[in-house]
UniProtKB/Swiss-Prot annotation:
This is Probable dual-specificity RNA methyltransferase RlmN. [4Fe-4S] cluster binds at residues 129, 133, 136. Residues 115-355 form the Radical SAM core domain. Its main location: cytoplasm.
Length: 368
């Protein structure tokens, strides 16, 4: 467990890397990998079709590939990366949390949420998190390691398969939104997260064919990485986990603020919004008597007025051993009104999954 305020930007050394997987590679790299084991390059396209378009991982499902080639291709490009430990469901089965065991025994979680008009999946980019926010169960656990691009992508592939196969009530469906708001700080695992976004949005069968506009990447505010992300030219939405409008409080709630202050973080976010043409999302967990004073709402509104932003207020979700709790309804209402008075769009998030520890800030990947 990290010490209060301690930050970890780099994953521990000596951690064994996951096996290479189709989803780690570009289409050109897949052809090279297939050729390296003596197979025709077009087999790479066939494998991509099975994985990204049909969600078919088992060699016996690849009927267009000779039986004698299947096992070699599986070993080279579709090794087993992760297995399901369990699913937990709530909301009549329309919210489902999955606990995954990775190849090395590491545990991570993802959450699928089906609404009447959309299906959203919250995915993890790291096992644990090094940002050490004291109100977040993931942050309090520390960082185990980064996930590979394929380990990130496979969470979505399995979610899409589950929706197609009717495992989630409501009939067959397709994912409409992906949010990098599960375990980890996405921009601290920059290259693999960017690789995952490319796999998710590459046209089928090279990728999953999802829209960049349906993807949200959340960050506590790693300013150099935000600038770098701006240069990628993505149309994803960027969400900044702000949680306080003043440096004095944010230094405590979001320890990375000791490196990059509120105005630096917001300016980097505004730059991304201008380049991408997407509104910046401001995430703010309301904590009773800590950051929910109306004057802080007023200060936040002043910082954001006239900017292309949307404020997402999150009633604090309980975590084991936490001394904090959600705001009183009257304080929440006054906070909303203080922000809205500056013409800044603000909503309170419809929190799901709290009963199964699947809501924002609750993912701890425990086998208990």
């Amino acid at each position: 467990m990290p010490k209060p305020g301690e930050l970890t930007f780099v994953a521990p050394r000596g951690v064994k890397k996951p096996p290479r997987h189709l989803a780690d590679l570009t289409p050109a790299e897949r052809k090279e990998a297939v050729a390296a084991i003596g197979e025709k390059p077009f087999r790479a396209k066939q494998l991509s079709q099975h994985y990204f378009a049909r969600y078919a991982h088992a060699p016996e499902q690849w009927t267009d590939i000779p039986a004698g080639s299947r096992e070699g291709l599986r070993e080279a490009l579709l090794p087993e990366l992760m297995t399901v430990v369990r699913h937990l469901s709530t909301d009549q089965g329309t919210t489902r949390k999955t606990l995954w065991k990775l190849f090395d025994g590491t545990l991570v979680e993802s959450v699928l949420m089906r609404y009447p008009d959309r299906v959203t999946m919250c995915i993890s980019s790291q096992a644990g998190c090094g940002m050490n926010c004291p109100f977040c169960a993931t942050g309090q656990a520390g960082l185990d390691r980064n996930l590979s691009t394929a380990e990130i992508v496979h969470q979505i592939v399995d979610g899409m398969r589950a929706l197609r196969d009717g495992e989630v009530p409501g009939g067959p469906a397709r994912l409409s939104n992906i949010v990098f708001m599960g375990m980890g700080e996405p921009l601290a695992n920059y290259n693999r997260v960017v690789g995952a976004i490319r796999r998710l949005t590459d046209p089928e069968p090279d990728g999953l064919g999802l829209s960049q506009r349906g993807i949200t990447v959340s960050t506590v505010g790693l300013v150099p990485a935000i600038h770098r992300f701006t240069g990628e030219g993505f149309k994803c939405r960027l969400a900044i986990s702000l949680h306080a409008p003043d440096d004095e409080l944010r230094d405590t709630l979001v320890p990375v603020n000791t490196r990059w202050k509120v105005r630096e973080v917001l300016d980097a976010g505004f730059e991304y919004a201008a380049k991408s043409g997407r509104r910046l999302s401001i995430e703010y967990a309301l904590i009773r008597d800590i950051n929910d004073q109306a004057w802080r709402g007023d200060r936040l509104g002043r910082l954001l007025r006239g900017r292309p932003v949307h404020v997402n207020l999150i009633p604090l979700n309980p975590t084991p051993g936490s001394k904090w709790t959600a705001s009183r309804p009257e304080d929440e209402k006054a906070f909303v009104e203080a922000i809205a008075a500056h013409g800044v769009p603000v909503t309170i998030r419809d929190t799901r999954g709290q009963e199964i520890d699947g809501a924002c800030g609750q993912l701890a990947a425990s086998e208990r």
